[in-house]
C-alpha cells in the first residue's frame, strides 16, 4: 500500500482534534444536517489552507460540489468490507508524520490484511527518518521506490503479519 489509506475520509478529518474525529461518522451517516455541513465547510476553509486544499482535491476526486455529498462519498471508501478477503502478499509503508493518514490506522490496515499470504509492514518515524515518515514517503521517493522494487523482486525478506 502506497500509502496505507484505510479510510479515504481520514484525509479530511486528520486535522481535527482526535476527540472530534468520531463525530464525522455520525455526520456522514446522517443526511439531515447536510445544510449545516455545507454551511460550515463554506466557512472553515477560510481559516485553514490545508482544509481548503483537501476539500478542493476531494471535490475533484469525487466530481461532487457540495461538501456534505463529498463527505458521504469519501466515507464509502474504506477497507472495512475487504477485511479478510485479501490473500496475496502485501507490503505496507507507513509514516507517523503523514499529513493525510492517521498513523493509528495501521492497526486497522493490519486487521484488514490478516489473511494476506504475507504482510511486510515498514514503519517510519519522524524522529529517526523524517523524509520517509511523510505521506507516501514523499521526502525520499527514490528510497520508497527502491523498497517497493526490492520487495517485488523478492530481494527483501517478507515477514508475517
Task: Show the residue positions of the predicted features.
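Generic beta-strand/beta-sheet core signal
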Residues: 2-3, 93-95, 124
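Conserved alpha/beta-hydrolase "acid-adjacent" motif
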Residues: 99-105
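Catalytic histidine neighborhood in serine/cysteine hydrolases
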Residues: 106, 110-132
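Short beta-strand/loop motif that positions the catalytic acidic residue
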Residues: 86-87, 92-94, 98
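Active-site nucleophile elbow and catalytic-triad environment of alpha/beta-hydrolase enzymes
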Residues: 64-82
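Alpha/beta-hydrolase-fold enzymes
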Residues: 1-64
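Catalytic active-site module of serine/aspartate enzymes centered on a nucleophile-bearing elbow/loop
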Residues: 125-161
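Hydrophobic, well-ordered secondary-structure elements that form the walls
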Residues: 86, 109, 148
